[in-house]
Regions:
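Extracytoplasmic/secreted envelope proteins and their assembly/folding machinery
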Residues: 34-37, 41, 129-132, 180
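N-terminal mature ectodomain segment of secretory-pathway/periplasmic proteins
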Residues: 33-38, 42-106
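Beta-turn initiation residues at beta-strand->coil junctions
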Residues: 56, 107-110, 193-197
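Bacterial N-terminal signal peptides that target proteins for export
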Residues: 1-10
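Acidic/charged, solvent-exposed loop-and-adjacent secondary-structure segments enriched in E/D, K/R, S/T
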Residues: 105-137
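Gly/Pro-enriched, hydrophobic low-complexity segments
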Residues: 30, 115, 148-233
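C-terminal segment of classical bacterial N-terminal signal peptides
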Residues: 14-24
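A short, amphipathic edge element
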Residues: 34-35, 139-151
Length: 233
């Protein structure tokens, strides 16, 4: 179920497009924090669709080993919990994950297998705890759950992308230690890093962003051949 964890983490990543971050700490780069929050809000309001490259690094702290993945992601926000997402991993193996109308399909061509299920069931099976919930939390819930913003600073990512770096630390028990977000000059979160309690870490990066391009709703539905084995997730 490792790819289901990917789904949870992606929702956290894309969820930063749609939620408000907790209030900043007094005296901690207040002007910088205010500016980046304003950019994020403007980006959230203007974003109707997104197509981009996506890379992911999953670090295993026990083995001190990193797995790397590359692909393409499509994202279309919607009211409530109905945002649509499609990730097509191109390496190291071809897999397609589509989420729409509260359902997900994970298609593995090499196995001729598709895992299908309710998106809300992912968090329990993915080992990612309440990560999915973060996408839908209100500002009040976020402020209750997270400490004030930490480690607020300017940082240039590879590809010469200028960003503001933010760190979110849960106030109480959570499935992860902390989350880091890198926001570009237009208010777009272009990179996130989730560090779990066992020090495993997942870093996601968006590249070649195309905002507000026309995306057909059909992109979020995978047409499966009759001979594909269906597994309930």
């Amino acid at each position: 179920m490792k790819r289901l964890a990917t789904l949870s983490l992606l929702f956290l990543f894309l969820g930063t497009l749609a939620v408000l971050i907790p209030k900043e700490a007094k005296g901690q780069s207040a002007g910088l924090v205010s500016a980046v929050l304003n950019r994020m809000e403007r980006n959230r309001q203007s974003l109707k669709s997104l197509r981009s490259g996506i890379s992911m690094e999953k670090y295993n702290a026990q083995l001190r080993d990193t797995d790397r993945y590359n692909g393409i992601v499509l994202y279309m926000p919607a009211a409530g919990r109905d945002a649509s997402v499609r990730i097509e991993w191109q390496s190291p193996q071809h897999e397609i994950l589509a989420v729409s109308k509260g359902k997900y399909t994970l298609f593995r061509p090499r196995l001729n297998q598709a895992i299908v299920g309710n998106k809300n069931s992912v968090k329990g099976k993915a080992g990612a705890g309440g990560i999915v919930e973060m996408m839908y939390m209100s500002r009040q819930q976020l402020e209750a759950r997270f400490q004030p913003l930490q480690d607020v600073r300017e940082e240039t990512l590879w590809g010469n992308v200028s960003t503001i770096h933010l760190t979110l630390v849960p106030k109480s028990n959570s499935s992860f230690k902390y989350a880091e977000i890198w926001v570009d000059s237009l208010g777009m979160p272009v990179q996130t890093k989730i560090v779990e309690k066992n020090d495993d870490a997942t870093t996601m990066r968006l590249t070649g962003l195309e905002k507000n391009v026309k995306i057909s709703p059909d992109e979020f539905s995978i047409k499966l051949d009759a001979n594909v084995k269906i597994v309930k997730g």
